[in-house]
């Protein structure tokens, strides 16, 4: 029997191998106990402040929206230690693992940011860790592979399937099933079997809580919308969580349209997929007519995922949040524009959210609106991917 509701409406659940059920229940109990433990919370907050660098700033874009009446604020998770929002919940889960007496950590990673966050947390807390990463992503994200190894992590390239994030997830689950007694799996997004979606949301919710306090101080009112990219959906649910009850604030999660939805080469399961069971949960899932998981595509390794966290599926199903999509090219354009006009190089993942916010501003230039974009990570890891794409266009001399 679970202590917390494992479902979000019809989405979520614990569809895991029987051997893992006691482990998931143990994790849930440890999380519930830790939430009510002042010592745990004090240690977590201390690490977030003194080690990770919270709170992160809320930055008004000075140049990006000239010619419109929109104000775009960036929630600067790119300035967090490790370079992305991933560090928040990894510190929380690593502390939970220590609390449970686990002596080994495993994780999956796509863009490498979750792997880097796991590696730094394990170095800090003296835990050995193994990171599973698709072989394609290892090539796309060489700087992050080096960073992980520099901090002592063992990085395992995964050659199965499309050699991307979903394949890394599968390998991590296999490892956990075989080694659950001494190993904790730090799942990198707000997806997977209960209690992971809830744990990750709660360890990321400070993003939205800080942003709410900061925007009230800056503008004296709440934003008209908060915008975040969605792969599995951890940065977005961290931003959305505190705003869900604020009915006047639109929640906009931006999925990757890849080469275009019509091509089939995308990673937009909410808008263009059916319900299915994947990675231990019921959610929207890209699958063919036989129910097999289809390959997703995005120029952004961190969004290259065929499913989505169950709370996002639920928020979409009840109409509380909208999930438009942005193509690779639109994300590349936004990446360049923020770099050129504000001096901030965003992650390609975050560039999807920014691209949609710019569409909102420019489609109604006379509309006075305040948008908060979650700048979930920095773009250092993407410079080679972007350089290759721009050379292909002849955009770089």
Swiss-Prot record:
Domain of life, source organism: Bacteria
Any GO CC annotation of this UniProt entry: cytoplasm
Sites of N6-(pyridoxal phosphate)lysine modification: 86
Pathway info: Amino-acid biosynthesis; L-tryptophan biosynthesis; L-tryptophan from chorismate: step 5/5
Family annotation (InterPro entries): Trp_synth_b_CS, Trp_synth_beta, Trp_synth_beta/beta-like, TrpB-like_PALP, TrpB-like_PALP_sf
Function statement: The beta subunit is responsible for the synthesis of L-tryptophan from indole and L-serine.
Subunit structure of this chain's protein: Tetramer of two alpha and two beta chains.
PANTHER family: TRYPTOPHAN SYNTHASE, TRYPTOPHAN SYNTHASE-RELATED
Name of the protein in its database record: Tryptophan synthase beta chain
Gene symbol of the encoding locus: trpB
């Amino acid at each position: 029997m679970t202590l917390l509701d494992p479902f979000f409406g019809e989405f979520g659940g614990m569809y895991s191998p029987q051997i893992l059920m006691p482990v998931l229940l143990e994790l849930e109990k440890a999380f519930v106990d830790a939430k009510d433990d002042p010592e745990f919370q004090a240690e977590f907050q201390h690490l977030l402040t003194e080690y990770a660098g919270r709170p992160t700033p809320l930055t008004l874009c000075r140049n990006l929206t000239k010619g419109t009446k929109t104000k775009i604020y960036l929630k600067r998770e790119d300035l967090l230690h490790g370079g992305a929002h991933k560090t928040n919940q990894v510190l929380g889960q690593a502390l939970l693992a220590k609390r449970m007496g686990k002596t080994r950590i495993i994780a999956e990673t796509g863009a490498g940011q979750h792997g880097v966050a796991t590696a730094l947390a394990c170095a800090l807390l003296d835990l050995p860790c193994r990171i599973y990463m698709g072989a394609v992503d290892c090539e796309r994200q060489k700087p992050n592979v080096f960073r992980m190894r520099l901090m002592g992590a063992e990085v395992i390239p995964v050659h199965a399937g499309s050699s991307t994030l979903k394949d890394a997830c599968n390998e991590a689950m296999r490892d956990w099933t075989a080694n659950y007694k001494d190993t904790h799996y730090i799942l990198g997004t707000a997806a997977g079997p209960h209690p992971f979606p809830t744990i990750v949301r709660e360890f990321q919710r400070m993003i939205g809580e800080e942003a709410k306090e900061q925007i009230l101080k800056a503008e004296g009112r709440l934003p008209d919308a908060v915008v975040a990219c969605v792969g599995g959906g951890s940065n977005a649910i961290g931003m959305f969580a505190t705003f869900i009850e604020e009915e006047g604030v639109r929640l906009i999660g931006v999925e990757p349209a890849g080469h275009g939805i019509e091509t089939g080469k995308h990673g937009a399961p909410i808008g263009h997929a059916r319900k299915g069971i994947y990675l231990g949960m019921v959610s929207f899932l890209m699958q063919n007519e036989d129910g097999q998981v289809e390959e997703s595509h995005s120029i952004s390794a961190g969004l290259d995922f065929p499913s989505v966290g169950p709370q996002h599926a639920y928020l979409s199903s009840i109409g509380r949040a909208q999930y438009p999509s942005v193509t690779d090219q639109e994300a590349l354009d936004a990446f360049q524009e923020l770099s050129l006009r504000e001096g901030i190089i965003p992650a390609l993942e975050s560039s999807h959210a920014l691209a949609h916010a710019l569409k909102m501003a420019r489609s109604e230039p006379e509309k006075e609106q305040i948008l908060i974009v979650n700048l979930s990570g920095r773009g250092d890891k993407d410079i080679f991917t972007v350089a290759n794409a721009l050379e292909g266009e002849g955009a770089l001399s």
